[in-house]
Swiss-Prot record:
It comes from Geotalea daltonii (strain DSM 22248 / JCM 15807 / FRC-32). The record marks 181-182 as: Cleavage (non-hydrolytic). InterPro entries: PS_Dcarbxylase (IPR003817), PSD-A (IPR033175). It is an enzyme of class 4 (lyase). This is Phosphatidylserine decarboxylase proenzyme. Heterodimer of a large membrane-associated beta subunit and a small pyruvoyl-containing alpha subunit. Coiled coil: none annotated. The active site is at residue 182. Catalyzes the formation of phosphatidylethanolamine (PtdEtn) from phosphatidylserine (PtdSer). Its EC number is 4.1.1.65. The keyword Membrane applies.
Amino acid sequence: MRNNNVPIAVEGLPFVAGAALISAIFIIIGWKVGAAFFIVVTVFIIFFFRNPKRVTPANEKAVVSPADGVVIYLGPAREPHLDQDMMKISIFMSVFNVHINRVPISARVVDQFYRPGKFLDVRHESATFENEQKGLVLETANGIRLVVVQVAGLIARRIVCYPTIGTMLRRGERYGLIRFGSRLDVYLPLDTELQVTMGDQTVAGETILGVTT
């Protein structure tokens, strides 16, 4: 979960190895078209599962983005799991974004949940309620609670989330990923001082979404 210095996410290595092996076989038997196709596939998989280094801001009260992408929703909303009003920030990840998810703030996992569901286009707000998702409830040393939810999308149908209840997480570290286009919903306390607006591009582990009070 903390292999931040590995250039390719370990979850992608089987896919890279498989595509590279097929490429090699086609090269050996002399099928140039097939070899060229799978070389391109191999390069794309490496690109998709890339794991760039990130520099996390020093401010311990800062909540950093858990995902690379663009802010598609920002405003008060009812968080379904805790059943309370919170500030919601939704980030859309296209197939071209880095899909490794990072911890938004140093905290302990106090609860987690999984909801089976559909695989609708995650750019629609209905995906928050209808799509398959995995969520973590985080609590900081100061008792501040946040919820971060990985939402599967039309293409992304495989959510990877490593932490379990009781796990202590460090801000900016890897905690999971979603494959091939998806969405992250982050729920913050209502009094959080927001640092992003609709349409902003975010970088996981670096972009400050807000500052807790």
